[in-house]
């Protein structure tokens, strides 16, 4: 191991492997390097804790950043652009801090956290123009719990903005998620369900499909502005039982403002202005749904309930 090393003000390009590799070394600082046109990752790290990676320019590699089995890592103020695969792929690493980075023009997922990257805090990043029309999420969580996505700009990515799969107790707060090529935010299940995730105080607008699509259980969707999406504003799929939709402002989404296909959903205190919407609130094949204290204006219909029981 090489603990407490500093790698600063270098240029590494056109290698047959990675630009910089840190392995089994703690308390390393990687600062203000240019890592470009390398065959694998620009920056690669494994089994190293308390590493700071800041102010680097990482571009035109096969992929940008890889972190595995490394806890308490800070990725700060890096420019990660123009990669054929991932922008940043992080796995099995706890308490990550990912702050004020720019991630653009990755063909694969721009920022992918997987396999127990719990307790991450991701804030004030710009994630733009990534993916293609079939794949490549701007932000992707898989098997990640108790992490926070806060005040990021997720804009004009060709696929979905934020996708959370088999992940629980995460918070998506105060982000701008706009003009993405599929969903704004999507919560999915896999072999286990996603549960107890919170989507709060975000602006989700002008996405090509649904603004927020939820398959997770016990999801809270609170105080978001969801507007001008080309399909539904919010859709809760049949797996998304016990979702709460509270205090949101839904404006002119082109499908239904809110579509519910799950049981035990609460829809309350939302403002729905649906001049471009089909139905303000549609409930299909769902039982024990509560709809209360909402303000609805416009749309072809106010509330539509079909094949459903036990309403309040």
Regions found by a protein language model. Give the residues of each.
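A cross-taxa feature marking solvent-exposed loop/turn segments within ectodomains of secreted
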Residues: 5, 15, 28, 38, ...
């Amino acid at each position: 191991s090489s603990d407490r090393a500093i790698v600063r003000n270098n240029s590494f390009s056109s290698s047959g492997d990675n630009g910089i590799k840190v392995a089994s070394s703690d308390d390393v600082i990687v600062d203000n390097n240019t890592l470009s046109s390398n065959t694998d990752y620009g920056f690669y790290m494994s089994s190293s804790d308390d590493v700071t990676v800041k102010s680097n320019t990482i571009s035109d590699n096969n992929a940008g950043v890889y972190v595995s089995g490394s806890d308490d890592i800070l990725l700060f103020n890096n420019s990660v652009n123009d990669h054929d695969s991932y922008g940043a792929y992080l796995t099995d690493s706890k308490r990550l801090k990912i702050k004020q980075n720019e991630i653009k023009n990755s063909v694969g997922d721009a920022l992918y956290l997987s396999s127990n990257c719990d307790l991450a805090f991701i804030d004030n990043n710009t994630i733009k123009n990534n993916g293609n029309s079939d794949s490549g999420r701007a932000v992707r969580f898989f098997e990640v719990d108790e992490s926070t996505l806060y005040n990021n700009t997720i804009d004009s990515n060709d696929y979905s903005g934020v996708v959370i799969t088999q992940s629980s107790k995460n918070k998506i707060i105060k982000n701008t998620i706009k003009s993405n090529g599929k969903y704004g935010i999507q919560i999915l299940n896999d072999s286990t369900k996603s549960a107890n995730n919170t989507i709060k105080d975000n602006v989700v607008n002008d996405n090509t499909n649904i603004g927020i699509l939820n398959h997770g259980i016990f999801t809270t969707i609170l105080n978001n502005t969801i507007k001008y999406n080309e399909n539904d504003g919010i859709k809760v799929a049949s797996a998304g039982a016990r979702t709460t939709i509270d205090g949101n402002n839904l404006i002119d989404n082109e499908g239904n403002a809110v579509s519910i296909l799950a049981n035990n959903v609460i829809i309350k205190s939302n403002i729905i202005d649906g001049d471009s919407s089909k139905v303000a609130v549609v409930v299909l094949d769902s039982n024990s749904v509560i709809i209360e204290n909402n303000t609805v204006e416009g749309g072809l219909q106010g509330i539509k309930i079909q094949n459903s029981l036990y309403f309040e």
